[in-house]
Structures are given as structure tokens and as C-alpha cells.
């Protein structure tokens, strides 16, 4: 998990964080696993 990926208990921060760094596969996978962030695809 990347350092800027927030803990699972911070769902609000997770959504905000992954929203801006969704391009990162590691964070995106982490978000999708917890269903905190929408599954967005980037080119």
C-alpha cells in the first residue's frame, strides 16, 4: 500500500485521496477492495 493511501477506518479520506490519485493501480486496487472509492479508469 502506498504511503498516501489512508487507513481503512478513514473512509472519507480514502474517497478523497483515491479520487485524486486514482491513476495509481495500488491505491485503486486498495480502494476497490474496501468499496470506499468509485471504480474509475484512467488512460
From Swiss-Prot:
This is Tail virion protein G9P. The chain crosses the membrane at residues 12-28. May initiate with G7P the virion concomitant assembly-budding process, by interacting with the packaging signal of the viral genome. The assembly-budding takes place at the host inner membrane. In turn, G7P and G9P are present at the end of the filamentous virion that emerges first from the bacterial host. Keywords: Host membrane, Membrane, Transmembrane, Transmembrane helix, Virion. Belongs to the inovirus G9P protein family. One of its GO terms (cellular component) is membrane. It comes from Xanthomonas phage phiLf. The lineage of its organism: Viruses, Monodnaviria, Loebvirae, Hofneiviricota, Faserviricetes. It comes from the Viruses. Its main location: virion. It is found in: Virion; Host membrane. It is a single-pass membrane protein.
